[in-house]
Amino acid sequence: MNDSEFHRLADQLWLTIEERLDDRDGDSDIDCEINGGVLTITFENGSKIIINRQEPLHQVWLATKQGGYHFDLKGDEWICDRSGETFWDLLEQAATQQAGETVSFR
């Protein structure tokens, strides 16, 4: 994968997250902001999830209250380089815990 393809795929990931949060019907207030290639999800309780791209490594990094995760693209899925879990699984787990209600991105 070259740098431009990586940025296209990361942009697509950011857009999907933003659209899913805009479309959700949950009770808690969840805000999403993109600034300089960093996506920040802020929850009603003040906690945050930070998602950024690491261009030199062609990775997406996810920082949550539970820890930090690094994802490589394998096929059409972003996969954690330590646990083998998908980006969507870990994001949903963290968002659900931090929101105090089920948050789905799929």
From Swiss-Prot:
GO terms for biological process: iron-sulfur cluster assembly. It comes from the Bacteria. The keyword Metal-binding applies. InterPro entries: CyaY (IPR047584), Frataxin/CyaY (IPR002908), Frataxin/CyaY_sf (IPR036524), Frataxin_CS (IPR020895). The keyword Iron applies. GO terms for molecular function: ferric iron binding; ferrous iron binding. Keywords: Iron, Metal-binding. Pfam families: Frataxin_Cyay. GO terms for cellular component: cytosol. HAMAP family: CyaY (MF_00142). Involved in iron-sulfur (Fe-S) cluster assembly. May act as a regulator of Fe-S biogenesis. NCBIfam families: FeS_CyaY. Belongs to the frataxin family. This is Iron-sulfur cluster assembly protein CyaY.
